Amino acid sequence: MNNTILPRNFYERPTLTVAGELLGKMLKFSNFSGIITEVEAYIGMDDPACHAARGYTNRTSVMFGTPGFSYVYFIYGMYYCLNIVTEAEGFPAAVLIRGLKLTEPLEANLGGPGILCKKLNITKEHNKQDLTISHEFCLYEYHLKPDYVCTPRIGISKGKEKFWRFKSCVLADMPKITLNNKY
């Protein structure tokens, strides 16, 4: 694995470009590492599924901020979700990390953003973290460019018609870990 952290300019590009190129990158969090297998894009105030569609709030402030920062939020009263801020500062956009092929400390597929955060212990304390400076919470180049498909986003009530869910065709071949699985 190349231990070069993805630089800020990687995230300062159009969200759909970043989303497609995040597939195959290595996510490092604490003692966990894994290859990103599935993501979804949320772009601007015109995207009804984007949290920033209702404007700037304390919760969404990070989405309007510097690209390359984490946006972690709580859903359904039980799950956290990890997003990475993209595009230019002032324009709210992010990529939701939906799937991860865990490689350390064990091999497994983490399917679903809530399960991913639960198993990695990513919580609200990890919101607004700069992913371009810390070797404990960052993304690395992995020199893997998997084929992928784009499908409609899932788990949302508005904006379902957008094919902004990117899913690797080859990285998701292992059984998925659920909340009932133990390490």
Swiss-Prot record:
Q: Which GO terms describe its molecular function?
A: alkylbase DNA N-glycosylase activity; DNA binding
Q: CDD domains this protein is in?
A: AAG
Among NCBIfam families, the record links this protein to:
3mg, PRK00802.1-4
**Gene3D superfamilies tied to this protein:** Methylpurine-DNA glycosylase (MPG)
Taxonomic source organism: Wolbachia pipientis subsp. Culex pipiens (strain wPip)
Q: What Pfam families does the annotation carry?
A: Pur_DNA_glyco (PF02245)
Know the name of this protein? Putative 3-methyladenine DNA glycosylase
- Tell me its family: Belongs to the DNA glycosylase MPG family.
> Per its UniProt record, what HAMAP family does this chain match?
3MGH (MF_00527)
Q: Which GO terms describe its biological process?
A: base-excision repair
Q: Which cysteines are joined by disulfide bonds?
A: none
**Keyword Metal-binding, does the record have it?**
no
Q: Which UniProt keywords apply?
A: DNA damage, DNA repair, Hydrolase
What broad class of enzyme is this? Answer: hydrolase
Q: Does the keyword Transcription apply?
A: no
UniProt-listed Enzyme Commission number(s): 3.2.2.-
